[in-house]
Amino acid sequence: MIYCLKCQKRGSVLVGTIFEHSKISLGTWLYLMLLMSNSSHTLPVSFVARHLGVTASSAFRMLACIRLHIEALHRGLVLGCSGEVIQVDETLIGSVKAGKGGGRSGAIVLGVYSSKGVVAQHIPNRRRETLFPLIQLHAAPGSWVATDQFRAYSSLSKLGFRHVSMNHGRREFVTAEGYSTVGIEGYWANLKFSLRSCNITPNFENLQPYLSEHAFKFSCRKRGIAPFEAMIADFPAIDFGKWSKRAARDIENHFSDGTEF
């Protein structure tokens, strides 16, 4: 606690962070952040509850809050620079029905990848007006942007990027100049394996925090930064409205044994 002699009021450095109003000790929170940063996969709620000695409800909410913190840290990441190659692609997370086009189902995720990290963003559709603002947000102007030949990317050069595309339908995965999207496609495989290995099937409404957690740790490894140090280096304001009503209902329905949060 901090005491101000001028206004004679007490304050806490935890105000505005995920630790505010929590009955769980700060040491327990930091230990869980260390566990998450050192794990290559998403931690299951049951493991956290057993390991920390808290209820499943508390474990669920702690994990959710830390993921929102990671999402806030990773939200403004800008990749690339003038002359550097950025790879952009989309993928589907979840079930995919047989066939193509309208027969598909699943969550659409846009990825922006470079040698310094990756950003993965859940998007509602693959329209140009959805894709371009995110690419502009996370790719530095003047970068080379490598994509497949999806028609929405055809006018990327008008945004100040130097665009190169590959025709995957004709099995063109690397251009004569050496440009490719192999990096982002490899990242998709890594992400999907991570979600499957822990039997994690987040609903589409709450998918983004899981994507941000995985992308944050992947980017830290790419840049040679300790994930835990990056996680506690800053505590931006959290918009808890992003934690949807669906998540709150999940807690009430599945973890009705009381909470320590």
Where do the model's predicted regions map?
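Residue-level recognition of single "structural anchor" positions
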Residues: 1-261
